[in-house]
């Protein structure tokens, strides 16, 4: 996923950062929009530190002190962009820009992220349907269900390939889904069948909750981590929609690609990283004091409460 190149000082390259809820993606595009460098990494909520590391790495390995056009996108990118003066572009707009550039015949985009889901209708104008208020039916939901089945997301995908039947499972909320999945586990249902049912639930949630009756047809594009990594999820969408969707090369990177294409302001990346250092040093956060000032205070509290108990009848 990574390719090095030697940059001439007269080259105009574009850098796009997509900072999502769980991952950070970065691309470098050449003068003709060719992909020169890309990376996809989890940030484990250390967004600031990971962004600084990436900016310095790209400068050292790719740009060698040269300026680059830069913009930032993603659900977790706005505050970071504001703090260092880099233009921010909304992720839906970034996706549309990249799709129009690299997959111009697309009629509809289905994108599942870590904690949100989107459908972009691109025919007869642009219409966006997005669920950003609940993680049901997203990558976080799939990870939660995989944990319930005591396997990784990759193992759950492989198990689902061997399914013989499916069950009805709610995906609007992980709590409701767990109340459907746990009884199936207790009753001895095949893990393979439960796994396939979970993917089917994601499909039903996306179509019913976002499409809301509007037909999904034509050239369908699948983007985002869950649809990139899960063959069963893509197949489930194909079967439900009666289409053959496309998961393009670099499907994980389309928001970052759109951010790079949108970029129109030059920066030295090490200077942006330094600006983030200054922001980190001066930022203040509103918070409540801890419940206990020390471990000893907590242990005293715990012992006091444990000394009182309701008599058993």
Q: Residues of each region from the PLM?
A:
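Conserved phosphate-binding/catalytic loops in two-lobed NTP-binding clefts
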Residues: 88-92, 238-257
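Short beta-strand-loop/turn "lid" adjacent to the catalytic site in phosphate-handling enzymes
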Residues: 40-43, 58-93, 120-129
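Glycine-rich phosphate-binding loops at beta-strand->alpha-helix junctions
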Residues: 76, 211-240, 251-255
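Glycine-rich phosphate-binding loop plus the immediately following alpha-helix
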Residues: 46-47, 124-165, 173, 252-255, ...
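Adenine-nucleotide phosphate-binding core of ATP-dependent small-molecule kinases
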Residues: 177-210
């Amino acid at each position: 996923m990574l390719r090095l190149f030697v940059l001439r000082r007269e080259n105009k390259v574009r850098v796009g950062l997509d900072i999502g809820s769980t991952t950070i993606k970065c691309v470098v595009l050449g003068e003709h929009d060719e992909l020169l460098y890309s990376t996809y990494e989890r940030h484990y909520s250390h967004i600031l530190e990971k962004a600084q590391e990436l900016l310095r790495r790209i400068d050292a390995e790719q740009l060698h002190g040269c300026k680059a056009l830069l913009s930032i996108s993603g659900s977790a990118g706005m505050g970071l962009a504001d703090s260092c003066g880099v233009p921010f572009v909304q992720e839906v707009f970034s996706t549309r820009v990249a799709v129009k550039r690299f997959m111009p015949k697309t009629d509809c985009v289905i994108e599942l992220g870590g904690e949100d889901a989107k459908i972009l209708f691109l025919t007869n104008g642009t219409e966006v349907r997005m669920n950003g208020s609940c993680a049901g039916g997203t990558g976080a939901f799939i990870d939660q269900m995989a944990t319930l089945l005591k396997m990784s997301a990759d193992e759950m995908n492989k198990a689902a390939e061997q399914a013989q039947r499916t069950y009805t499972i709610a995906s609007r909320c992980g709590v409701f889904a767990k109340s459907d999945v746990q009884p199936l586990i207790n009753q001895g249902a095949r893990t393979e069948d439960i796994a396939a049912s979970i993917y089917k639930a994601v499909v039903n949630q996306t179509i019913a909750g976002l499409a809301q009756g509007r037909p999904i047809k034509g050239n369908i594009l699948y983007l985002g981590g869950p649809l990139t990594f899960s063959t069963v999820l893509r197949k489930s969408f194909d079967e439900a929609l009666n289409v053959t969707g496309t998961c393009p090369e670099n499907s994980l990177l389309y928001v970052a690609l759109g951010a790079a294409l949108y970029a129109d302001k030059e920066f030295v990346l090490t200077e942006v990283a330094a600006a983030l250092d200054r922001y980190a040093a001066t930022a203040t956060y509103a918070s409540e004091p801890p419940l206990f000032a020390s471990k000893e205070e907590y242990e005293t509290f715990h012992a006091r409460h444990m000394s009182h108990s309701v008599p058993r009848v």
